[in-house]
């Protein structure tokens, strides 16, 4: 069985999304929920205190009333108060949860992930999962969270220790301010901690998903064969043959400043000019036989051919012919163009 050393293609990533293999961190979701709770208590604390005072006052007014009547009235009042108080809280937490998931993975309909899988009840498979890398990382992460949260709580209680000793001489209003200040800073400390944990966990999940979706060289070749059998690809091949016959493809290659390729399957022609084309464009691209044809034309016309697997794939799958490169590819394309220009300059200085 071939070793899986190749990075996943765009098609592989799309198929992974359909199966629920997306980069998602539960810690980031927890962070959004903590922020929602913090904002709720920050803006609605006074309202909650007023509701509490009204409830206590209403209870005292019912002291001399018959028990059944008082119980009914008090129950109705509590239900009404709790409903109004918790409605915004529940809505805020739900919005924060859904929003965090949407920001991480977008809209994903993973129908394959919902279906029944026999390995879920396979004891051997489940035993392996217990000792998998993911399980070890989750155990370490949980232990780290317990330790760090304990240290955060210990630090703030130690910091407020002298203030607590003065509370008996402070009065009720002062005590409420001290406790509310402690709770606020504890909450902020926990949120900062979850920001750090969320970034680390998201990075690990990204690494794990990419690792799980890696492909062997045979997988990549098979995927290209499958694409070649697609009707759209056949139509594109006929268009490519027409372009070759008309000379438009060769003309596009000759106008490019560099050709980026992955070793055998993909070739992309980049066009750039400081004034006429300040943002690089994909002038032409091709796969398999067309890629070899592009490389041959480039080599015959002394156009630099650079092998860069990641960049070639990104340009091929993300940018259409004639389109400008997206901002996400500015840096690698700029680095490639700088290298090509240095080579051209070195050749020009060496030529007598």
From Swiss-Prot:
Record keywords: Cell membrane, Membrane, Protein transport, Transmembrane, Transmembrane helix, Transport
Annotated Pfam families: Bac_export_2
One Gene Ontology CC term in the entry: plasma membrane
InterPro entries in the cross-refs: BsaZ-like, T3SS_substrate_exporter, T3SS_substrate_exporter_C
Bilayer topology: Multi-pass membrane protein
Transmembrane segments: 34-54, 89-109, 144-164, 176-196
Gene Ontology biological-process annotations: protein secretion
Main location per the UniProt record: membrane
Entry's localization field: Cell membrane
Coiled coil: none
Similarity comment: Belongs to the type III secretion exporter family.
Function: Part of a type III secretion system.
Name of the protein in its database record: Secretion system apparatus protein SsaU
Species of origin: Salmonella typhimurium (strain LT2 / SGSC1412 / ATCC 700720)
Top-level taxonomy: Bacteria, Pseudomonadati, Pseudomonadota, Gammaproteobacteria, Enterobacterales
């Amino acid at each position: 069985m071939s070793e899986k050393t190749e990075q996943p293609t765009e098609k592989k990533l799309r198929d992974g999304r359909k199966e629920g293999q997306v980069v998602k961190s539960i810690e980031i979701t927890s962070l959004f929920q903590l922020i929602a709770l913090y904002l709720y208590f920050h803006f609605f604390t006074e309202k909650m205190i007023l509701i509490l005072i009204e409830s206590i006052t209403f209870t005292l007014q019912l002291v001399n009333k018959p028990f059944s009547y008082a119980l009914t009235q008090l129950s109705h009042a509590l239900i009404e108060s709790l409903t109004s108080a918790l409605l915004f809280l529940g809505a805020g937490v739900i919005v924060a949860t859904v929003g965090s998931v949407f920001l991480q993975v977008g809209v994903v309909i993973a129908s394959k992930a919902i279906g029944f899988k026999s390995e879920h009840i396979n004891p051997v498979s489940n035993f392996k999962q217990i000792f998998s890398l993911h399980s070890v990382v989750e155990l370490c992460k949980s232990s780290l969270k317990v330790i760090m949260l304990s240290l955060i709580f210990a630090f703030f209680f130690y910091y407020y220790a002298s203030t607590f000793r003065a509370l008996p001489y402070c009065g009720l209003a002062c005590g409420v301010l001290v406790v509310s200040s402690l709770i606020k800073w504890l909450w902020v400390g926990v949120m900062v901690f979850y920001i750090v944990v969320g970034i680390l966990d998201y990075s690990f999940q990204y690494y794990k998903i990419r690792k799980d979706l890696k492909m062997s060289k045979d997988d990549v070749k098979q995927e290209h064969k499958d694409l070649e059998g697609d009707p759209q690809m056949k139509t594109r091949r006929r268009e490519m043959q027409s372009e070759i016959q008309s000379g438009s493809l060769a003309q596009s290659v000759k106008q490019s400043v560099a050709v980026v390729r992955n070793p055998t399957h993909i070739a992309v022609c980049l066009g750039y000019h400081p004034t006429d084309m300040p943002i690089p464009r994909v002038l032409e691209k091709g796969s398999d036989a067309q890629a070899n044809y592009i490389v041959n034309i480039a080599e015959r016309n002394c156009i630099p051919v650079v092998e860069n697997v990641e960049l070639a794939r990104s340009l091929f799958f993300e940018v259409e012919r004639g389109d400008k490169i997206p901002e996400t590819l500015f840096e690698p394309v700029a680095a490639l163009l700088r290298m090509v220009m240095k080579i051209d300059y070195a050749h020009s200085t060496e030529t007598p």
